[in-house]
């Protein structure tokens, strides 16, 4: 994903985003992540970069998210006692939701997990698990929660914003192993 949130160590400029987009292979969906950005800025990025999906990771209302005529997902910061299904229902026009850990004052990328039991509910659409995932815990997370996808950042970095190829490969291998085990258990 392309992070358009200047306060993030993973943030990219519009010029960097265009350079990245130019080398992305076919059938790979570019995701643009925004945090409480204004509509003009979001629209400007969408005009300049071939984004296939928007991820809203702030306090954006459903109507705001839906106005850009592009598939979108909404990140929900899960906190203790939260009714995850009810929060997801507010974003019923989204293509899905991303569940991340809540940490006051930080919209995401905290490296913290949340109480996964809160996500063990019937969610109304495809959902993505985020929040503190790494090579050590992602296999268990996928097997327990069976999300449509997982999202990782800090869990495969050597320092904020700097990815480690070895950690990425190990993370992908752990996800694949969980998927294979789930496929095997579904065949029985």
What residue spans do the PLM features occupy?
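Conserved N-terminal beta1-alpha1 strand-loop-helix module at the mouth
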Residues: 1-188
């Amino acid at each position: 994903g392309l992070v358009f949130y200047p306060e993030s160590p993973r943030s990219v400029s519009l010029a960097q985003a265009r350079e990245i987009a130019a080398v992305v292979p076919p059938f790979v969906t570019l995701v643009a992540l925004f945090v409480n950005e204004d509509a003009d800025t979001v629209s400007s990025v969408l005009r300049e970069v071939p984004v296939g999906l928007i991820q809203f990771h702030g306090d954006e209302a459903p109507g705001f998210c839906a106005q850009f005529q592009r598939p979108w997902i909404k990140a929900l910061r899960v906190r203790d006692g939260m009714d995850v299904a009810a929060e997801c229902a507010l974003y019923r026009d989204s293509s899905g939701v991303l569940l991340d850990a809540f940490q006051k004052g930080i919209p995401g990328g905290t490296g913290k997990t949340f109480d996964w039991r809160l996500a063990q509910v019937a969610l109304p659409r495809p959902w993505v698990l985020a929040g503190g995932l790494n090579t050590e815990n992602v296999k268990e997370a996928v097997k327990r929660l069976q999300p449509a996808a997982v999202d990782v950042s800090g869990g495969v970095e050597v320092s904020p914003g700097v990815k480690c190829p070895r950690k990425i490969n190990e993370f992908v291998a752990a996800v694949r192993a969980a998927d294979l085990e789930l496929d095997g258990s579904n065949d029985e």
